[in-house]
């Protein structure tokens, strides 16, 4: 069996004295889309922040391409090829759309994602490239956040609640772009409360409940009843 791109093993994580994750394990294969679902406070964002190096953990709790990175700082994780699209987008208000995108490419990692390719993926950003990024609609700001992460030419893209606060039609538009991203050879981990979108986009699903994996399996094999039981802990 080929080695996974990402291998999370018995990960414990938290904030100070508060423990948010308890022995979480998951794998992501090259080119795979994995969804992590769960209610508010289930530990989904903590999992992504741990993988991204925003929260340091045990060295061998997270392996990327076979290399232990659990204790790596965020900048070292990005350099290895992992990029995070954070919850809330976190764009630089004083910078234009194009300036925000260019920040993602500062490491100079080689790959297919250039400004031209981002504008091809999200044409509306080309039209608004000289505007302040925070003057855009919420959906367009999310496109900037995704584009900025892609500009680092990652092998693994982590997306934290990309549908949060967006109209359903905008969410569908953004999710419709994900296959084009995967086609460039990326793997994706999507944290999502919208279960329908998560199941449609992913091949594997992990459901967290109070910091633990309550359910894991192929997206097309999980029943609504099983997901509801794991999601709500009933």
For the regions a language model picked out, list residue spans one by one.
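The feature captures the beta-strand-to-loop junction immediately N-terminal to the Walker
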Residues: 37-39
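Helix-to-loop junction immediately C-terminal to a conserved catalytic motif
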Residues: 52
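Conserved ABC transporter NBD signature motif
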Residues: 60-68, 80, 113-114, 120, ...
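Conserved ABC ATPase signature
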Residues: 132-136, 140
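ABC ATPase C-loop
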Residues: 149-150
